[in-house]
Amino acid sequence: SWQSDKFDNFYPRLVEIIRKHCPKSEIVIQQTWSYASDDPRVAKPSPTWGFDQDEMYRRLNENYRNMAKALNARIIPTGYAVQLSRERAPEKYTGFDKADVSRYVHPDLPPASPIEVVGSFCWHKDSKTGKYVMWQDTFHLNKRGEYMQACVWYMFLFGRTGADIRFVPESITKEDSAFLIGCAESAVRDYPQVRNLKE
């Protein structure tokens, strides 16, 4: 989280439990990511949080690094991989056209963004009216993001490289998987850890 108070008061207890039951385990920290740029909390020109997507990442990265320093722990740099995918994308994600999205009728959904790795659409049933309402998720990883995150974890936890990854889900093209693997590999290789595995 970009808000340190969301976990500063809770992670010490979690670490205490882990160290009690698994004293020899390495504690690592999963770094999350900033929301999609069309989330109203970070959307320009007037985000409700008062800052944009890049500033959200800067703040959450600072909080994760502070926690990692306190624990002498490594960070799984998923959020950094998300940032790299945004920087390297052939075009900038600008969000979905609301008029286009409104034409969809349950159970059909708009296609996933071929650019952004965060966000998707789903239907939920309104408990009062019983009607299906489309909801846009602008903060969880979509299928592309989940694949990239899996690549980050695999390379981070097992010391592997992108060349070791051969699985490509049917929903992702080989070209896109190469792009996502490349972002994941760069993140794992280049993220400046506060602790080295050899320490």
What residues fall within each predicted segment?
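A structural signal for well-ordered alpha-helical segments within the folded catalytic domains
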Residues: E62, K143-M155
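Substrate-binding/catalytic groove segments of enzymes
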Residues: M155-F167
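Alpha-helical cap/lid subdomain in secreted, periplasmic
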Residues: S1-K143, D164
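A cross-kingdom marker for long, charged
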Residues: F167-E199
